[in-house]
């Protein structure tokens, strides 16, 4: 099933649900908003995705069925991740992220190596190397924008959650993570894993990632037991509480090494794969529209700005002040731009196994929207599979008018107090019900912090030509990657 075939079958059926038979199984594809909400409302004894999750962990991460067989340990790990939904974690994580970005935003690109007197010059940051930064004599910089952004953002977020020693000891961690992401759909197809170059790179990268995450786990577990993990790991005192707790869960439940390292790789990938890419696509859409760029900069100016007292970071670059609360509450346009980016960029399928027969009924408004005379009810039998066709719904002109157009205002409406407010409406990129994304609240603040800070600190233009063009989307991992990276010229707005 892909977006093209799903769109064709949706349009041909005219219904809120249509079905496929693949082998011995029957798959019911949901493509109407009111039906999606009913799916989210079902309990786990009616609809769940446990078998799908077990299959994915076995196929994508080679967990050798440990997710299936070590039930207590696996669910203990997921319960520990629930901390990411709690206000204390969100405030801690976003506060630490904002503090880092206030200093690091000006360091998206640093300074040319030849400006330093030592013979070997100043080494590039890892994200600069990934973005193949070129330092121009006129004070501007050139870089591959996608690789620069996803690795810059990944460095800060990984350091904040897992501590700085992880990447310090495994400097190729992000390169491996993005190689895995590029080829994960080849791995899932199985026979492509060893045939295609992307598949082979992904398998090799996955192996290195599991080694890195197990070494990190062993070091933290050793520290928690009151022993010295070794000088290369340092104090390990900058690790977030949620990751500290997960190590304790693995120890308490006597989880196997395979379960620990494969699930830790899945969390590392999951934390980065959507947010980092969305910041890239969001920045590309905004920088390529001068009026939108101007409006967003004006909107965020009171809440994200250069330090009024001229503070500078330890490297001498200008420091930002970021008011997270003001950014979230009083900047509807940039938040709507984030939602619109997800609508156009994230194309995934939500899977639910049907444990008991379930009846789903179209709403009258949705039936009218789809041109039907009356709502239809569907009985979905136990033993079948429900598929939520998020990607095709997000590009359905009946649900989102002019879906090919980047139009953030579609998510802005007037609130009860007359002020504009942003609502996701029929956008379900964070899932819902039992399977709502655990990192949703942090992810939204994280994306706005990174995007707003870079919009304030940097001008971005094409290396060739007058207008920045948004690249075409390919497929990789959970969110789309560009088919080709885009080479840009960056200029720091404040020195």
Where are these regions (language model features)?
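Hydrophobic, well-ordered secondary-structure elements that form the walls
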Residues: 341, 383, 406, 433, ...
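Conserved cytochrome P450 K-helix/beta-meander segment immediately N-terminal to the heme-binding cysteine loop
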Residues: 382, 388-418
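Cytochrome P450 heme-binding "Cys pocket" and the immediately downstream C-terminal segment
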Residues: 292, 423, 440-478
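Classical protein tyrosine phosphatase
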Residues: 275-298
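Cytochrome P450 heme-thiolate monooxygenase catalytic core
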Residues: 99-279
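Conserved cytochrome P450 K-helix E-x-x-R motif and the immediately C-terminal K′/meander segment
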Residues: 1-7, 306-376
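C-terminal helix/juxtamembrane-tail motif
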Residues: 478-495
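N-terminal membrane-proximal hinge/A-helix region immediately C-terminal to the signal-anchor transmembrane segment
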Residues: 1-80
